Design a protein with these regions (language model features):
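Bacterial N-terminal signal peptides that target proteins for export
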Residues: 1-9
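ATP/NTP phosphate-donor binding region
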Residues: 24-99
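Short Gly/Thr/Asp-enriched flexible loops that form oxyanion-binding sites at enzyme active sites
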Residues: 112-132
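Conserved small/polar residues in nucleotide/adenosyl-binding loops
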Residues: 206-212
Length: 212
């Protein structure tokens, strides 16, 4: 009987330890809108592709490491290329973000987005989100099926950024190719280069290294 009690006690302690570890991680919610990061092409070497084809659940399966950083959940808002972004989607995003933050159990939000209108979406949300919690936009210059897809690392870095306490009070930011850029100064400067987002008139917040 004593042996059974010890086993039960050990099991209970293990469960409590596991629950405590989970509770310590921030809760990050991803709102997916499509874009190149969710795009697919005919082969790994083809440059033509269709944006917004891959669901957020599939994108997250490709980056299991994010679960070591945060409790990550996701939902699909739309599946579009960002050239088709419009004010209706902007208003939907702003409303949903404010709803999520008002609940109190969401610590940060990541938005997967195409790069063509990412800076406009970031600027709009920077004006309409009523919280100092992190909102991070992320995308890719190469589709998910490309041999050298940049989406997985960008998504990982976006979750790292949204989960960081230091990101609070910084407004909406863009996390692309290791850079974190404020919504007020970020702009797309190249149609093919992965280092396309820059802040020529302001300083980027930081440069994320691969191991962070």
């Amino acid at each position: 009987m004593n042996g059974l009690r010890k086993l039960s006690l050990m099991a209970a302690m293990l469960v409590c330890t596991t629950l405590a570890a989970v509770a310590q991680k921030p809760n990050i919610h991803i709102l997916a809108t499509g874009g190149t990061i969710a795009g697919t092409g005919a082969s790994a070497t083809k440059t033509n592709y269709t944006a917004g084809q891959v669901a957020i659940s599939t994108l997250l399966e490709a980056v299991p490491e994010v679960n070591k950083i945060a409790n990550v959940t996701g939902e699909q808002i739309v599946k579009i290329g960002s050239q088709d972004m419009n004010d209706a989607v902007w208003l939907t995003l702003a409303k949903r973000i404010n709803e999520l933050f008002s609940r109190g159990d969401v610590d940060g939000i990541v938005i997967t987005h195409g790069t063509d209108t990412m800076e406009e979406t970031a600027f709009f949300l920077n004006l309409t989100v009523k919280s100092d919690k992190p909102v991070v936009l992320v995308g890719a210059m190469r589709p998910s099926t490309a041999m050298s897809a940049d989406g997985p690392l960008n998504l990982y870095n976006a979750v790292v950024t949204a989960a960081a306490r230091e990101s609070r009070g910084k407004g909406v930011v863009i996390a692309m190719n290791g850079l974190i850029l404020g919504a007020h100064g970020a702009m797309k400067t190249n149609t093919v280069d992965v280092q396309t987002f820059q802040s020529p008139n302001s300083v980027s917040y930081t440069h994320l290294r691969a191991h962070e």
